[in-house]
Amino acid sequence: MMKRYFVTAFLAAMMMMIAPSEMSAQEDNGFKKFSVEEAFEDNGFQWFRDAQLLCAGSKEKRPTAEGRSHGENAMTIGWGGIGTLWRKTALTVYVAEKRYTKEFMDNSEYFTVMTFDVKDSKVLNYMGTKSGRDGNKADALGLHSAYTANGTPYYTEATMVIECKTMYAAPFDPQGFRSDTPRQMYANFPAGIHSMYIGEVVNAWKK
C-alpha cells in the first residue's frame, strides 16, 4: 500500500513538472494564453484586411527543391475567416499555388497566424513582397523563431499567435465558380489558384 502511494505521488509530481514546461514556452516570451471564443476582441472582417502573418513548418530543417534547408516559412495574408465549422472553432486561410509557404502548409499538421504591432509594419511588408526561396526572411528581419508544444513555429516579436490544426486542405476548383469575381481574379493571377486551409483553433496567446 505504501509503495503504491509513493509511486502515485511520484507520477503526480512528474506531471506537475512536465505540464508547466509545455505552457511556459510562450509565457517566457511574454505571451499569455487566452480563449478565442471568449476574448477575441477584433472585428472578424477587418482582422484579415489589416493583414496577418501565416507560418508553417517545424524546427527540423528539410531540403528544398532549390537545395536550401529551411525549417519554416512565413508569408503575409489578407484573405481568411474565423468562425465555427464542424462544431470546432475554425480559422481559414488561403495560399496561392506558387507561394513558397504552400510547401510548408502541405507538409505540416499545424500552422500559426500572427499579428504584429503597427510599428512593425515593415515585417508584414517584407514578408508579403519577398520570397523565402531567395533567403531566410525571418533572419533578414531579425525575427526570433520559437515553437509551441506541438512544434509549430511562430515569432516571439508577434503580439498575438493563433495555433491551428489543419482539418481540411484543397485548391479551389474552377468548375465550382458561380460568378465572374473569381474567374476574373484568376484570369491573370501569376501566383496561381489558391488553396483553402481550414484549421481548428487549438491554442491562442497574446501579449
What are these regions (language model features)?
Residues M1, I18-A19:
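Short intrinsically disordered, low-complexity coil segments enriched in acidic
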Residues M1-F10:
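Bacterial N-terminal signal peptides that target proteins for export
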Residues Q26-K207:
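Active-site-proximal mixed secondary-structure blocks
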Residues A9-I18:
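Bacterial N-terminal signal peptides
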